[in-house]
Amino acid sequence: MNVIGIESSCDDTAIAIVNSNREIIANVVISQYTEHLPYSGVVPEIAARAHLKNLQYAMKETLNQAKINFTDIDVIAATSGPGLIGGVIVGSVFGQAIACALGKDFIAVNHLEGHILAVRLNENISFPYLVLLVSGGHCQFIAVLGVGKYKILGQTIDDAVGEAFDKTARLLKLGYPGGPIIEKLASKGDPHKYSLPLSMTKKSGCDLSFSGLKTAVKQLIFSIESLSEKVICDICASFQYTVVQILLCRSINAIKLFESYCSNNFKINRKNYFVISGGVAANQYLRQEIFNLASTYGYCGVAPPSNLCTDNAAMIAWAGIERLNANLFSSNFVPRAKWSVEEL
């Protein structure tokens, strides 16, 4: 079975073809980096117009990569939320139009579910498992009991961690997106040079907060007269270290909540998995620290490859396959900007 996946929820236009044997036959991502760079962030209207322009080319390139025709496609899956509504509508309607023209099933995919299930495209891990989903717009601990069966154990009460990376990069005039740039500069800096607040780490549960950290970084930057390269590297290292410490601290509580929740609702596996996914999971320092923590608590730390952590259509196609196999899909769906995984 060959499934086309379409992703357009933010600033990357992506189309992929994945089959039911977990093979990525084609995977095309068209970046909108140059369109948004002058604004140091994503402009929704510009993103939607770029998706409209890029989708047709991306589809053609995907079919060329796969060396197949539309007649070889069985199902169309497209991100239908959450995300920037203009882009979500463009991609979802594009997918529905193709499905209608081909007489094939259309599957509306939750973008976050794509991230949650992406790890199963490369690793045949069984349910249940714990996910730390970290991206530009979301930061959540999720108990994954099965396809479409999710419990949010904790989440950010204000800003997402990816947004904090981008804001810090903007303050330092480093460019966009901020995550990869800060990670690179942090490797040259002293992570203990500046003390930054470990927000909510003393509280029960596993909710998170990054607004206080953002404010502290802003105040720190404005207090320094000369931002030399060494100072910038130290700020990046201290910021990244603090973010990771917050996530590690809250992960400990999340593991306890996950085990409690599963003991009441599911027979937990002998081998437990702690998955980190989402765009920020491409950060190698964060990934390794989460793996180390997972091992300490008897879990196997797992993450999708970096190219499947950032927004991509292969994870959307795979989520479509998972939902099709579970018979959990409907062709009657309206794209939406907000869509919790607990509503699936």
Curated annotation (Swiss-Prot):
It catalyses: L-threonylcarbamoyladenylate + adenosine(37) in tRNA = N(6)-L-threonylcarbamoyladenosine(37) in tRNA + AMP + H(+). The keyword Chloroplast does not apply. GO terms for molecular function: iron ion binding; N(6)-L-threonylcarbamoyladenine synthase activity. Substrate binds at residues 133-137, 166, 179, 283. Binds 1 Fe(2+) ion per subunit. The keyword Cytoplasm applies. Its cofactor is Fe(2+). GO terms for cellular component: cytoplasm. It is found in: Cytoplasm. Coiled coil: none annotated. HAMAP family: TsaD. Required for the formation of a threonylcarbamoyl group on adenosine at position 37 (t(6)A37) in tRNAs that read codons beginning with adenine. Is involved in the transfer of the threonylcarbamoyl moiety of threonylcarbamoyl-AMP (TC-AMP) to the N6 group of A37, together with TsaE and TsaB. TsaD likely plays a direct catalytic role in this reaction. Belongs to the KAE1 / TsaD family. This is tRNA N6-adenosine threonylcarbamoyltransferase.
